[in-house]
Amino acid sequence: LSRKDKERIFEQKMSPLYISVHTTVPVLRQELLENPKARPILEEIAEMTEHHIVLHTQIVLCPGLNDGHYLTKSIQELADCYPGVESLAIVPVGLTRHRANLPEVKTVDAHYARELIALVYTWQERFKKTLGEPFVFAADEWYVIGDVVFPPLEAYGALQQLENGVGMLPLFLETFEKTDFSEPLCAEEPTRFILVTGTSFSSFLTDCLKKVRCDNIEFQVLTIINHFFGDSITVAGLVTGKDIINAVLENRTHRYSRSVTRGETKGLDVLLIPEVMLAETKKDFLDGTTPQEIEAALEMPVHIVPADAMGFIETLKILAESPRDRLLDHFVMDEHSLDEGSLMDNGLGMVTGPRALWRAER
C-alpha cells in the first residue's frame, strides 16, 4: 500500500481490513512476493493497529516453502498482535498451469490437508485458553481436499473470514438444511436451471438441490473444469467465461438444448452463474468474457446469482416465476475491501481464495 492509501485508511478509519501475510519471516516473505523491498509485515501490522485498524489476516500455505517451523512462527507472531489482529485464515495454495521457469511448489494432497486441519485444531484449543478465541482457522478447501467433515458452524466464531473461504461451505449447507422447502418452486413452463460451479463445490451443491421441491422445474449442476488456469484449480471463484461456454456447448448434445422437449411441451434452459465468478468490477469474468457474451454464445437466458445460500434460494424463487426476466444488478463492492488481496500468480504461479480479488503484491 502506498503512503497515500494508508493515510486514507487512517483518516476514514477503514476497519476492519483483510490483508495477505503468507509469512511473518521477512526474507521468506520477500522471496514469496518476489519483492526484495517488501517491508516486514509485522511493522506494517503495528502501524495499522496503532491507528486502531483491526486486521484479519491470511496465509496462503505452500508446502515446502512457508509451512513447518515458518508456519509455527507466523501463527504465534500474528496471535501476539491480538486483538489488533483479530483472526488468521490458512488457505491452500492453488497452482496454475502458467509455471514455466518458476520455483517448484508441491501440490497439496489429502494427507497434507488432514495434517494441517489437525495442526489448526491444536492451535485453536491453545488460543481459546489464552485469547478466549480460536483465532486461527483452516479454509473450507482443506476439508474438501482431505475429505474431512466440517466442524459445526459455531466453531467458526463470528465468521470473520468468509471472504477467505472459511466457513462459507458449512454456512451454505446449514442454511439449506434449515430452509423450509415444503412449498415447491413452480414454473409455468418446464424449466431446466443449469447451475455452473467449480469441482470443489459441485457435489455439495448437487446434494443441496435435492432438498428443493419442484413443480415443472429441474436442476442440472454442471462442473466446470478450469482449462484457463489449469485443472488443479477447483474453486468457483476462478472459473472463466470461455470455460463456461465450452462446457455447456460440449454437454448440450446429450444433456442440454435451448428448447428441451418433454412430451408435447417445450421447455426452457436457463444458465445460473454464481456472482463469485465475476471479477472485481462485477462486469466480466477473469478472462474478460462478459455475461452478455455467454448469453449470446449459448442462446439461453443467463442470470448471475448470489453465492450465499439465502440469497441464492430467494433468487431461485424469483426466477422460478419469471425465468426470462432480467434481474437487477445486486452487487455492491464493499469499500473496506481495500485489502492487499488474495495472491494471484505472484510469479510463483499461485492463486487462492474463493473470490476474484486480484490485487497481487509486488
Predicted regions and their residues:
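Conserved Radical SAM active-site core
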Residues: 1-84, 95-123
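Auxiliary Fe-S-binding modules of radical SAM enzymes
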Residues: 80-81, 89, 94-362
